[in-house]
Amino acid sequence: MKLFILAVGHKMPGWIASGFDEYTKRMPPELRIELREIKPELRSGGRSADSVMAAERQKIEAALPKGARIVALDERGRDWTTMQLAQALPGWQQDGRDVAFVIGGADGLDPELKARADVLLRISSMTLPHGMVRVLLAEQLYRAWSITQNHPYHRA
């Protein structure tokens, strides 16, 4: 199983890439994280948010690994604790499907993509910069894995 993070956005600051890389390099070979950046659509020429999200959805769908479990990050998603994420990981590994975490663009994710998702997950009740979400998600995936391995990284 492989973990994918599909994120609408590009040209993140160096500190975002550095933070993201720090956690992805800690992951074991059987749980590698791959980032797939999706170029955001321009909101020029009077385009509506709906048309932008629909165009971004098409790009996201083209980048999704075939048969992957989709975890869409959304402000109206379910709140999971780190322990709940840690409990989900082994089951996901056992079923063998790749897992794709999807971070939308500035306008969010298209409703069709959210409806198709296996899980709608809220990473925070606060509004966060999309680059920061990449780092937080990578850290939480590493922490969840460390919990499943009784690794000392997580001390609770």
UniProtKB/Swiss-Prot annotation:
InterPro entries: Alpha/beta_knot_MTases, RlmH-like, tRNA_m1G_MTases_N
Subcellular location: Cytoplasm
Binding site for S-adenosyl-L-methionine: L73, G104, I123, S124, S125, M126, T127, L128
Predominant location: cytoplasm
EC numbers for this chain: 2.1.1.177
Catalyzed chemical reaction(s): pseudouridine(1915) in 23S rRNA + S-adenosyl-L-methionine = N(3)-methylpseudouridine(1915) in 23S rRNA + S-adenosyl-L-homocysteine + H(+)
Enzyme class: transferase
UniProt GO MF annotations: rRNA (pseudouridine-N3-)-methyltransferase activity
Keyword annotations: Cytoplasm, Methyltransferase, rRNA processing, S-adenosyl-L-methionine, Transferase
Any one cellular-component term (Gene Ontology): cytoplasm
Function: Specifically methylates the pseudouridine at position 1915 (m3Psi1915) in 23S rRNA.
Subunit text: Homodimer.
Family: Belongs to the RNA methyltransferase RlmH family.
This protein's name: Ribosomal RNA large subunit methyltransferase H
